[in-house]
């Protein structure tokens, strides 16, 4: 860990840990929504998200402690704006349709994935194998979670739009099938050649 300033790494880990906790809080608030209870796939997904983000948050906290990092006043200020945005999501959780909550989860998980991509690069630059392992595992898990949300999202949209449960199920499954095609390997560009 000689190439990168330890304080910078610690601040970055603390920043990501705070973001992870805010997203986890939003997920926990969503679980209280009566509307969520109407879609069993959403209930199962929120349980999965809560478990995964709880574990990730604990590992990030341990990494922050290892770097003797505490959330600074400056960082708290920066996070306050974002936390305010998330608080809006949380406050709306009880009245928002499930599809909107799933969309917000998709966005939040994507932001966490970007943060863990940055953390992986930081850990590589710092030659910190433990942090590389944490970031890599979290990123892989977040990719799976985003994919799971992408399956529940179209189903929740269709169920909110159609009154006929059989028709909603049929079209919902078709929507999942059609939208999941975008996640096929041929739609992902090969890694750029590094010269």
Model segments located where?
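Alpha-helical bundle segments that constitute or directly flank the non-heme di-iron/ferroxidase center
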Residues: 4-37, 99-126
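Soluble, non-transmembrane catalytic domains of enzymes that act on hydrophobic metabolites at membranes
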Residues: 9-13, 35-41, 45-46, 59, ...
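Short, charged, amphipathic alpha-helical segments
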Residues: 14, 40-48, 77, 103, ...
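Charged, amphipathic alpha-helical oligomerization/scaffolding segments
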Residues: 15-22, 48, 52-55, 59, ...
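Preference for long, well-ordered alpha-helical segments
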Residues: 23-26, 105-191
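Conserved alpha-helical segments that form or flank metal/cofactor-binding pockets of metalloenzymes
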Residues: 39-79
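Carboxylate-rich helix-loop segments that flank metal/cofactor sites and access channels
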Residues: 62-103, 165-175
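Long, non-catalytic architectural segments outside compact domain cores
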Residues: 194-195
């Amino acid at each position: 860990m000689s190439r990168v300033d330890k304080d910078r790494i610690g601040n970055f880990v603390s920043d990501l840990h705070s973001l992870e906790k805010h997203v986890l809080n939003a997920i926990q608030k969503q679980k209280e929504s009566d509307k969520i209870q109407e879609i069993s796939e959403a209930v199962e997904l929120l349980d999965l998200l809560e478990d995964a983000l709880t574990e990730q948050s604990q590992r990030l906290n341990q990494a922050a402690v290892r770097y003797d990092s505490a959330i600074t006043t400056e960082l708290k200020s920066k996070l306050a704006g974002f936390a305010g945005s998330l608080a809006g999501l949380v406050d709306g959780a009880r009245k928002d349709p499930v599809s909107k909550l799933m969309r917000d989860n998709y966005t939040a998980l994507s932001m966490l994935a970007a943060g863990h991509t940055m953390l992986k690069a930081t850990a590589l630059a710092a030659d910190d194998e433990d942090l590389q392992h944490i970031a890599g595992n979290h990123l892989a898990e977040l990719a799976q979670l985003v994919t799971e949300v992408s399956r529940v999202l179209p189903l929740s949209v269709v169920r909110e739009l159609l009154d006929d449960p059989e028709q909603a199920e049929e079209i919902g499954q078709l929507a999942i099938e059609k939208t999941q095609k975008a996640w096929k390997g041929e739609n992902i560009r090969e890694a750029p050649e590094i010269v």
